[in-house]
Design a protein with these regions (language model features):
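A composition-driven surface/loop motif
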Residues: 1-253, 257
Length: 262
């Protein structure tokens, strides 16, 4: 909390082990990482931040510039701060580990920006479920020839009850239990500054892309049923719609994605 840390490594940037007797005292490792402030910048050839059991981010500024997988643990809780992640494989990964815990990514606040590289990758990947009740999440995935990837990939469910999630890329799994969502079925997302505004010109959400995507959805508690909205890019209208309840699932081929988001 409060420090400025710069890490360059070939192995994991930050790692918390849960192996038996791993501590100098002979005690078992806890496998828990908690970040409550400060600035952390990581360039690594493996995981940016890896906790064998639990990763908790409540505040601070995290920038994973390069990694194989950005943030990884069985349970990942993000309630605050700003997290920017670039990964060659999965950006945020809730993986199976001890065989007794169900993987979960739970976001209740903060700002999260995830970009993945080319290939069979996922922006957010949970071997369990993904839940979000607050915060802003911008996740960008895609695919290369003969390989498929997604913005959010889960073995369980995507449940969004609050906050905002913008998902762009290849196969975009959509929430099963959520606040209002909208899937863009005929919009190509090119590089630029995007905003969603209501009919009175009030800005609901905004985000910036460095490259192009051909599939995406937004899910936010700021969308109101039976209200008209317009999506803009660099000030020009791309599409408009009247928000209705419910979501749909689309499969489309993605365009090249951001290679890096700084």
């Amino acid at each position: 909390s409060g420090a400025a840390i710069n890490i360059s490594s070939t192995d994991d940037g930050i790692h918390a082990n849960s192996d038996s007797g791993v501590l100098e005292t002979g005690e078992d490792g806890k496998g828990i990482i908690s970040i409550s402030g400060g600035t952390i910048t990581i360039s690594t050839g493996d995981d940016g931040i890896h906790a064998d059991k639990e990763l908790n981010i409540t505040d601070g500024y995290i920038n994973v510039l390069t990694s194989y997988e950005g943030l990884e643990a069985i349970t990942i809780n993000i309630s605050g701060g700003q997290s920017f992640v670039y990964a060659a494989d999965d950006g945020i990964n809730a993986c199976t580990g001890d065989g007794t815990s169900t993987p979960l990514i739970n976001i209740t606040g903060g700002y999260v920006d995830v970009t993945t590289g080319s290939g069979d990758t996922d922006g957010i990947d949970s071997n369990g479920s993904y839940t979000q009740s607050g915060g802003m999440v911008l996740v960008k995935g895609g695919s290369s020839s003969g390989q498929v990837s997604g913005s959010i990939d889960v073995d369980g469910n995507i449940t969004i009850t609050g906050g905002t999630c913008v998902a762009l890329g290849g196969i975009c799994e959509t929430p099963v239990n959520s606040v209002n969502a909208y899937v863009f079925s005929s919009v190509s997302f090119n590089a630029g500054s995007y905003s969603v505004k209501d009919s009175s010109g009030n800005e609901i959400i905004s985000f910036t892309l460095n490259n192009s995507y051909s599939n995406g959805w937004i899910c936010t508690s700021a969308l109101t049923t039976n209200t008209e909205y317009t999506l803009y890019c660099d000030g020009s209208s791309l599409t408009n719609w009247t928000q209705s309840a419910g979501t749909c699932l689309l499969y489309t081929s993605p365009s090249p994605r951001d290679k890096r988001q700084s």
